[in-house]
UniProtKB/Swiss-Prot annotation:
An MF annotation (GO) of this entry: AMP binding
Classification via Pfam families: AceK_kinase (PF06315), AceK_regulatory (PF20423)
Function comment: Bifunctional enzyme which can phosphorylate or dephosphorylate isocitrate dehydrogenase (IDH) on a specific serine residue. This is a regulatory mechanism which enables bacteria to bypass the Krebs cycle via the glyoxylate shunt in response to the source of carbon. When bacteria are grown on glucose, IDH is fully active and unphosphorylated, but when grown on acetate or ethanol, the activity of IDH declines drastically concomitant with its phosphorylation.
Record field: catalytic activity: L-seryl-[isocitrate dehydrogenase] + ATP = O-phospho-L-seryl-[isocitrate dehydrogenase] + ADP + H(+)
Protein's name in the database: Isocitrate dehydrogenase kinase/phosphatase
Length: 577
C-alpha cells in the first residue's frame, strides 16, 4: 500500500460517521413535527429507519475503502497506522466516543469480526474518561420560583417549542404544584428550583419534558409526559419525581427516545445525576445511540470480568428449547446462544430466530420486551467457563464454537439484561406480591398485543421480573404480529367422548390460536388461577383478541404509559370544574 493512504482511510471513516450522525440528527429533528401532526405511524417508521442508518452508513464506508485500496489485503502494520491517524483526529471531535464505535464497526465489517484486539480496535476509548468538548450552548435552563411555582411552571411551559394549543394549562400547573407540595411540603418546595433540558424527549405518542428538581435534600428527576387529546390539544398526564420512576421511563425494555443531541456525551453526563442506577451503556441506549451502547456494554462486561473470580454458569430457570442461556453469577446480564438443534416441537430455523430478535429491536417494545445486543465471534477464556457449562456448550452449540486452546470463540450470541424468571418469582412470592406479579403479567400481554405483538409462547418461564417489579417478555422465537394470527373459539364437542380424546375434534391450521387453552397453562396453580380469572379472564376469549386485531387493522395506535394508571393526573386528582 502507498504511504499516506492510512490518513485518507482514517479521514474517510470519520467522514462516513459524520454523514451517519448527520442523518441521525435529521431524522430525530423531525420528531416534533410528527408529534404535532399526531402522525403515529410516521413515528414508528422513523424509529425503524433511524435504527437502520448506522449499518447502512457502515456499509457505504466499507465500499469506499475497498475502492480506495483496490480490494487489496492490508497487513497488521498498515491497520495499526490507520488507527493511529484516526486517534489523532479525535481530541477536538465533538462525538469522539461514537466515532470510535463506528471505526470498530467498519473494521468488523471488513474483517468479518475477526482479530478483534485492543491494538486494532477501540476496545476501550482512546480519550480521557467522560471528556467532551466545551458545550457551545447549555443543555438545560434554570428556573427559580422568585414569584412562586405557578409563575415558574408557566414560564417552563411557555418556553416549550410545541405549537399546539393547550387544553387547560392552569389545570396542569395546579396538578404539578399539588404533586410537588404533597411530596416536599410547602416550605421545602419554596426553597427548590428546576433545571429543564432544552430539548424535548419524544417517544411513542408523548413528548417528555426532562428536568432536575433541585431541593434542600438533593436533586430529583422531574419528568412531565405531554400528550394530545383527540382534538389535538396538549395536556400533561402526570409528574414523575423519583429515581425509580425515572429509571422505568428510561428502561431497557422501552423504545429509544428521539432527542436532538449533537453532543451525546454531554447529554449522557447530564442525565447521569437523575438516573444514578443506569450504566453508561443504558444511557446511550435510551437516547438512541444503540451501537455505541453496545460498545459500552461490552466494556462494562470486560471491567466486571477483570474484577471478579466467577465462572460462567447456565442461567437459572427452565432450560430453553431454542436458546442456551448462561451468565456470571454476580453480573446483571445473560448471554444467549442459538442451539444447533431445537426441540422437536420447535419447527423453525436459526435464521427465523434471528429475524425475530431483529423484529424486537426495530419494533415499539412498549416497556415489555427486553432489548438485546448482538455479537459475532465472541471470545471467552476457558478458565472463566465452568466445566458443566463447557460440556453443555459443546453438546448444544458445538457448530457455533471454535476451540483456540485456552479460549473458545462463539460465532454468534446475544447479550440481554438479566431478570428473575417469572415462574421462579411466582414460586417465591405470595400475598400482594403474587397479586402484583399476575397483574403485571396480564398487563404485559395486553400492552404487547396492543402494539401488534403476539408472544406466541405465553408460559411464565418466557417472562422475567425486573428490579422494579415489572414483567418483561424475553423469549422471542415464536413472536409474530397480532395481525398474522387467527384467533378461534373452540367449537362445541360433537359427543361427550370428544372431550376425553387425545386429539382435537376440530381442524387446526398453522396460525390458529385458541385463547381458551391459555387457561390450562396459566391457571393450573390454585394460588394463581383465581387471581387470573379476576383480573385477566378476557385474555381467554377469542373475541377479545379479534377486537384488538380490528383496532390495529383500522390504524389505531394505542397509548403507552411508562407509569401506573393510578399515577395519571386524570385518575389521581378530580378534574377541576
Amino acid at each position: 500500500m502507498p504511504r499516506g493512504l492510512e490518513l485518507l482511510i482514517a479521514q474517510t471513516i470519520l467522514q462516513g460517521f459524520d454523514a451517519q450522525y448527520g442523518r441521525f440528527l435529521e431524522v430525530t429533528s423531525g420528531a416534533q413535527q410528527r408529534f404535532e401532526q399526531a402522525d403515529w405511524h410516521a413515528v414508528q417508521q422513523a424509529m425503524k429507519s433511524r435504527i437502520h442508518l448506522y449499518d447502512h452508513h457502515v456499509g457505504l464506508v466499507v465500499e469506499q475503502l475497498r475502492c480506495i485500496t483496490n480490494g487489496q489485503s492490508t497487513d497488521a502494520a498498515f491497520l495499526l497506522r490507520v488507527k493511529e491517524h484516526y486517534t489523532r483526529l479525535l481530541p477536538d471531535y465533538p462525538r469522539f466516543e461514537i466515532a470510535e464505535s463506528f471505526f470498530n464497526s467498519v473494521y468488523c465489517r471488513l474483517f468479518d469480526h475477526r482479530s478483534l484486539t485492543p491494538e486494532r480496535l477501540f476496545i476501550f476509548s482512546s480519550q480521557p474518561e467522560r471528556r467532551f468538548r466545551t458545550i457551545p450552548r447549555p443543555l438545560a435552563k434554570d428556573f427559580y420560583p422568585d414569584h412562586g411555582w405557578e409563575s415558574l411552571l408557566m414560564r417552563v411551559i411557555s418556553d416549550l417549542p410545541l405549537r399546539l394549543r393547550w387544553q387547560n394549562k392552569s389545570r396542569d400547573i395546579h396538578y404539578i404544584i399539588r404533586h410537588l407540595t404533597e411530596m416536599l411540603g410547602t416550605d421545602n418546595l419554596a426553597e427548590s428550583h428546576l433545571q429543564v433540558a432544552n430539548e424535548l424527549f419524544y417517544r411513542n405518542k408523548a413528548a417528555w419534558l426532562v428536568g432536575k428538581l433541585n431541593t434542600p435534600f438533593g436533586t430529583l428527576p422531574f419528568l412531565l409526559p405531554i400528550h394530545q387529546t383527540d382534538d389535538g390539544e396538549l395536556f400533561i398526564d402526570t409528574c414523575l419525581t423519583t429515581t425509580a420512576e425515572a429509571s422505568i421511563v428510561f428502561g431497557f425494555a422501552r423504545s429509544y427516545f428521539m432527542v436532538y443531541a449533537p453532543l451525546p456525551a454531554a447529554l449522557v453526563e447530564w442525565l447521569r445525576e437523575i438516573l444514578p442506577g443506569k450504566t453508561t451503556a443504558e444511557l446511550y441506549m435510551a437516547i438512541g445511540c444503540q451501537k455505541h451502547a453496545k460498545t459500552e456494554s461490552y466494556r462494562e462486561y470486560l471491567v466486571y470480568l477483570q474484577g471478579c473470580n466467577e465462572q460462567f454458569i447456565e442461567a437459572p430457570g427452565i432450560r430453553g428449547m431454542v436458546m442456551l442461556v448462561f451468565t456470571l453469577p454476580g453480573f446483571d446480564r445473560v448471554f444467549k446462544v442459538i442451539k444447533d438443534k431445537f426441540a422437536p416441537q420447535k419447527e423453525m430455523s436459526a435464521a427465523h430466530v434471528r429475524a425475530c430478535y431483529q423484529l424486537v429491536k426495530e419494533h415499539d417494545r412498549v416497556g415489555r420486551m427486553a432489548d438485546t445486543q448482538e455479537f459475532e465471534n465472541f471470545v471467552l477464556e476457558k478458565r472463566h467457563i465452568s466445566p458443566t457449562l463447557m460440556e453443555l456448550l459443546l453438546q448444544e452449540a458445538a457448530e457455533k464454537i471454535t476451540d483456540l486452546g485456552e479460549q473458545i470463540v462463539i460465532r454468534h450470541l446475544y447479550i440481554e439484561r438479566r431478570m428473575v424468571p417469572l415462574n421462579i418469582w411466582l414460586e417465591q412470592v405470595e400475598g400482594q406480591q403474587l397479586r402484583d406479579a399476575i397483574e403485571e403479567y396480564g398487563n404485559a400481554i395486553r400492552q404487547l398485543a396492543a402494539a401488534n405483538i403476539f408472544p406466541g409462547d405465553m408460559l411464565f418461564k418466557n417472562f422475567g421480573v425486573t428490579r422494579h417489579g415489572r414483567v418483561v417478555f424475553y423469549d422471542y422465537d415464536e413472536i409474530c404480529y397480532m395481525t398474522e394470527v387467527n384467533f378461534r373459539d373452540i367449537p362445541p364437542s360433537r359427543y361427550p367422548e370428544d372431550e376425553l380424546a387425545s386429539e382435537p375434534w376440530y381442524s387446526v391450521s398453522p396460525g390458529d390460536v385458541f385463547p381458551e387453552e391459555f387457561r390450562h397453562w396459566l391457571c393450573a396453580d390454585p394460588r394463581i388461577g383465581p387471581l387470573f380469572e379476576e383480573m385477566h379472564a378476557d385474555l381467554f376469549r377469542a373475541d377479545y383478541w379479534r377486537a384488538l386485531q380490528n383496532r390495529i387493522r383500522e390504524g389505531h395506535v394505542e397509548d403507552v404509559y411508562a407509569y401506573r394508571r393510578r399515577q395519571r393526573f386524570s385518575v389521581r386528582y378530580r378534574p377541576q370544574v
